[in-house]
Design a protein with these regions (language model features):
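Preference for long, amphipathic alpha-helical scaffolds in soluble/luminal domains
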Residues: 1-8, 15-21, 25-352
Length: 352
């Protein structure tokens, strides 16, 4: 399926006039830093990332880093995640940094399930209560909206507009359904939600990168593997035809961001195929995947963290998002053998 690429375009002359300043409502992003050469020894990568995590991350991301890379305790991650849990069984309190305020929101649910999946703890009474919560907040078609309307003016990212009667979206429903299926959760809520996802995935025509990511998350966990493989093959062709993925980071100027995305907010093969067993891995050649992972490794900044390509809309959200991006980068690099398969360096030692 991977095909030939177009020839590179002529670069803009350095003396060309600066393009006009975008209107105030146009998404903006911090300028991309120069990409350093990836280090040959993986330990400095982890050392720098660890320092960045201790300096900037929330308690949850600190505990997650310790669990995944320092033989930390899963209970500590669980406890940190529990501080975002609401009495209704959902998650809030800016667990996803793009949605501020205490209210339970579907994006927070997807974030919590990713954390629990990484711990191997996506089961039990907590998940039963969560599914009951999802049953009570679903749209008439059994799906989840991106953002529920809030009784107070809690801040949200401008790319997540709030509607009085929001429709169900694959963007949120896909990851939640996929992660529950991946962990063999069975609940009545999943029946209609799964049908919704199948309908959206198999009828996608014009789409955008984050919606594709959500479709991949659904296909990654859904039980019908033959149907998932067929849907993934079709989706991969669509992604390449619509140029939704930067296949060669050296030619990223040829892949403009999707409408509504910030300048530089482009996705690469590793953003879709986060693990070698992902249904999206077959969309890309070995060479395309190698270039993508080289680019990811080289994107580590001088402070040890990875950049965020989304629109910078609030200082707190941007600060909280970078450690999350750093953890995702490290986990992806390790999944592809770019870091040690299991890091067992000693974790933090409490004072005597």
């Amino acid at each position: 399926m991977p095909g030939d690429e177009a020839s590179p375009q002529s670069p803009r002359s350095p003396r060309s006039p600066r393009p006009p300043r975008p209107p105030a409502h146009t998404p903006t992003a911090l300028p991309a830093p120069p990409a350093p050469r990836p280090p040959s020894d993986p330990l400095p990568v982890l050392d720098r990332a660890e320092r960045f995590i201790w300096l900037t991350a929330r308690v949850l991301e600190q505990r997650r880093f310790a669990f995944h890379f320092l033989d930390g305790d899963a209970d500590a991650v669980d406890t940190a995640l529990g501080s975002y849990l609401n009495p209704d069984g959902g998650y809030g309190h800016a667990l996803d940094p793009d949605l501020r305020g205490p209210l339970s929101q579907p994006l927070h649910t997807a974030h919590a399930l990713r954390v629990l999946d990484g711990l191997g703890r996506c089961a039990g009474q907590r998940i039963e209560r969560l599914c009951r919560h999802l049953t009570g907040v679903s749209t008439p078609d059994g799906a989840l909206p991106v953002v529920f309307p809030a009784p107070h003016d809690y801040p949200t990212a401008p790319y997540h507009p709030m509607h009085d009667d929001p429709p169900g979206e694959l963007l949120t429903t896909g990851p939640v359904v996929g992660l529950l299926h991946r962990n063999r959760v069975w609940h009545a809520w999943l029946f209609r939600a799964t049908d919704f996802c199948w309908d959206r995935v198999e009828n996608l025509h014009r789409t955008h990168p984050y919606e594709v990511q959500s479709a991949v998350a659904f296909l990654d966990g859904v039980p019908d593997r033959a149907r998932a493989a067929a849907a993934a093959d079709r989706l991969g062709r669509l992604v390449r035809e619509q140029r939704l993925v930067v296949l060669d980071p050296r030619r990223r100027a040829e892949y403009p961001p999707a409408p509504g995305y910030a300048p530089g907010e482009q996705l690469f093969p590793h953003d879709f195929a986060r693990r070698p067993e992902s249904p999206a891995r077959g969309w890309f050649t070995d060479e395309e995947m190698r270039r993508s992972l080289d680019f990811l490794a080289a994107a580590q900044q001088a402070d040890g963290g990875w950049p965020v390509r989304r629109e910078a809309w609030a200082p707190g959200s941007s600060l909280e998002r970078r450690p999350i991006a750093t953890l995702e980068a490290l986990l992806t690099l390790r999944a592809y053998g770019r870091l040690p398969a299991r890091v067992s360096r000693p974790g933090p030692v409490p004072p005597r």
